[in-house]
Structure formats: C-alpha cells, structure tokens
Amino acid sequence: MPRTKIPKNSKRNREVANREEKVRLYELKMDSRLISIDSLETKFLSAVDHQVKTLLGQVQKELANLKMPEVLRLFEELDRFSDFKASDQTQLLASMSMSGSAIEGHAPSATGSRNDEEDSSIGASGGSILAAHTGSLLRSTKAMRTPGPLHSARARRARRSRSACGDLNILHSAKPPSISSSSSSSRNSRSKLRTPMASRAKAFSADRTPLKQKQMRSGSPTTPPMAFLRYPKPGEVALSKYGSPMVAQVMPDKFANVNIPIRNGVLSLRPKKLDADEVESNLLENLDEDTLNQIKTLHENLQMIVNKASQAVFK
C-alpha cells in the first residue's frame, strides 16, 4: 500500500506560499488605495493653489507687498481695494514692460481682474499680475507636506517624489519655444569623446551592418550555384555573405571527389576506377531513397559537365 501521508516539508512550503500570496495581494490593494488618495490630494491641492493664484493675480504688486500695520491703516483710508492707487514709479515700470512685450510680438497678459471702476491703475496691474503669479508659484513650490499616517506609510516604500519640477514647468511653458539646432539631433556619445583607437578596416557583419546597407545587399550575391561550390585554398579565409569569418572545410589534396552520406558514415568516391567486386553491397544497403535520388541528380550533373568539357576540348 502506498503511503498517503503528506510530508511536513511540502505542507509547510504550501503554507508559506499562501501567506506570501496574501501579503502580496494586501500590498497591491494598499498601493492602489494610496495612489487614489494621492490623486485626490493632488486634485484638492491644485484647486486651492489655483484659487490662491487667482486672488494674488487680482491684487496689485504694491498692495501685495504691504505689511500688516500698513494694511490696517489702509483699511481706515479706503472703502475697497479697487480704490488703491499705485505710485508713479510702479505705473512707469508697468507701462514700459507692456510696451516692450508689444514690440516683441507677445500679447499682454490678460489674467488681471477687471475692476468695477476703470481708473489709471489698470495699466499698472497688467505688469504686476505676472510678477505676483510667478511669486505665488515659487512660494507654492517651497511648501512642505504635513506629516501624518499616510506619510509614514509611504516612507516604507520607494515611490515617485512630488518635487517642485512639475510646478516649475508652468513657468518655463510661458517662454516661446526655442528653435533647436541641427547639431542637437546628432549627439556625440561617450565613446566618441574618448581617445580614438588605431584605425582599422571593419568587416561587415550581421550585427554591425546598418539597415540601409543590409537592404542593398539583401539580394543574392554573385556566387556560383550550389552545384559548383569551391573549397577555400590552404591559408585562405572564408567569409560569409555579410563578411563574417567562417570555419570552412579545406581540401587536403587537389583532386575531385564525391561525398555520399549514408546512415553510418560518409562514402567518399575518389578519382580512381572501381571494379564491380570492389563495391560492397552492405554499404549500398545503408542508402535511403532521398540520398539515392540525390545521387541520380549528381550523376546527371557530372555527365553534363563531362559532355561540355569534352566539346570544349575538341573545339
């Protein structure tokens, strides 16, 4: 009777595998949940940041730079912020920046708010909006995340950092796209910057040949057909179609021969006249039908060569 008792080692291994699978599924679920929480956090932070940027864009530059005591004194003098007048120097700088942008062909910024009362401060608000918007972006990049349970859980795993690069790209996107030169497309690799080796002729190979040269040489090369293969001479290097060196069989002697593969070896025919009793019948029994058909085709080719050579000699 075969023993049906399960070994303890296999049972223990199966339990360990089950525990690892459960832990892996739990980690996958936690990762998906953390990703969803991060997406919600990013969504709400971007909404709040957008509202703050909108408010900062509506406030004039001098008004935004005021300190708290000055703001309190300003509340006593003004009924609303739209009545605040910028100084003459600020208006001059704003008008110069607006005229410079108009000469360069850039449209002036239209992010500033339209006050209920149109006064002389509208021209100065256009130049101050971009500066306030840029300052708010830079201040938002320096904000630190509030530590909490989510932050400690994320610290256990290597995740993508939420750096300031994503927000700073908005600043760079306002610049006009620069026209890249033709030299950037062909970049020098590290090997080209090193000391060059001695120049040598590189053979064409299947792994080094460019695609265009492969297509040019994809056709049949100018080599004779398979019935007229030539063995390399002693000391001659045999190359493949694409120039790779090959290990080829070298003829030891300079004479014609015919090699016939049989089941237990190769039957080599030398240019020597054979008698009928020299041909062993047990060797011919090892020939299969395909090899016999190949020998017949080879016999016809040899007979054709003999006839052509005889006609060429007698002419």
From Swiss-Prot:
It is found in: Nucleus; Chromosome, Centromere; Cytoplasm, Cytoskeleton, Spindle. Transmembrane segments: none annotated. The modification Phosphothreonine is found at residues 146, 209. Pfam families: Borealin. GO terms for biological process: cell division; mitotic sister chromatid segregation; protein localization to spindle microtubule. Belongs to the borealin family. It comes from the Eukaryota. Residues 103-126, 138-226 are annotated as: Disordered. Component of the chromosomal passenger complex (CPC), a complex that acts as a key regulator of embryonic mitosis. The CPC complex has essential functions at the centromere for ensuring sister chromatid cohesion, recruitment of the CPC to kinetochores, and chromosome alignment and segregation. There is no function in meiotic histone phosphorylation or spindle formation. Ubiquitously expressed in the early embryo. Expression is restricted to the ventral nerve cord and brain during later embryonic stages. Disruption phenotype: Flies show multiple mitotic defects, including multipolar spindles that result in large polyploid cells and often in delayed apoptosis. The developmental consequences of these defects include cell-autonomous and non-autonomous defects in cell-type specification and tissue architecture. Flies also display a drastic decrease in histone H3 'Ser-10' phosphorylation, suggesting that the CPC complex mediates phosphorylation of 'Ser-10' of histone H3. Disulfide bonds: none annotated. This is Borealin. Component of the CPC complex. The gene is borr. Coiled coil: none annotated. One of its GO terms (molecular function) is DNA binding. Keywords: Cell cycle, Cell division, Centromere, Chromosome, Cytoplasm, Cytoskeleton, Mitosis, Nucleus, Phosphoprotein. Residues 153-162 have a biased composition (Basic residues). GO terms for cellular component: cell cortex; chromatin; chromosome passenger complex; chromosome, centromeric region; kinetochore; meiotic spindle midzone; nucleus; spindle midzone. Its main location: nucleus. The modification Phosphoserine is found at residues 152, 163, 205, 218, 220, 244.
